[in-house]
Amino acid sequence: MGYKEEYQRWLEMFANDAETINELKGIAGDEKEIEDRFYTELAFGTAGLRGVLGMGTNRMNVYNVRRATMGVAKYLIAQGVQDQGVAIAYDSRIKSDVFARETALTLAAAGVKAYLFDALRPVPVLSYAVRHLGCAAGVVITASHNPPQYNGYKMWMLRSYRRSLQSLLQRQLPGL
């Protein structure tokens, strides 16, 4: 499917989401912007997702956060560690709290225990929580040093799981 078709698909698929529709209608006629947002899917790299905030397959938004989280949930369930849970932290960037909450809700809906911090926490606190609680993984919503229009979804896992999760998500996410 080309980027124009994907753009149209999002307009139809999210017709009841006013925020998404308003943003997407706001770029109507701007071929370069539509292409940039929809020519590819945001890729899961070594530590997770990172991208410019906005609507589209190549942007950081709740839909891509849910998609990545479903991939993580499927992996943890396949490993039999869903009851160990996932600790979730977030920083002060735009929508970090929203993405963290969506991560927790998506994990819970998939049957994976989720521990969501109730306020901002730095990455070292997340890594401590993962070990202290015996979690299978941790997620921190942050884009670290990137400009303010970016956000990210970073995974924290034990080394034994990290490579196989990354490999699985790179294969699986296009189908989710």
Predicted regions and their residues:
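Gly/Ser-rich phosphate-binding catalytic loop and adjacent alpha/beta segment
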Residues: 3-176
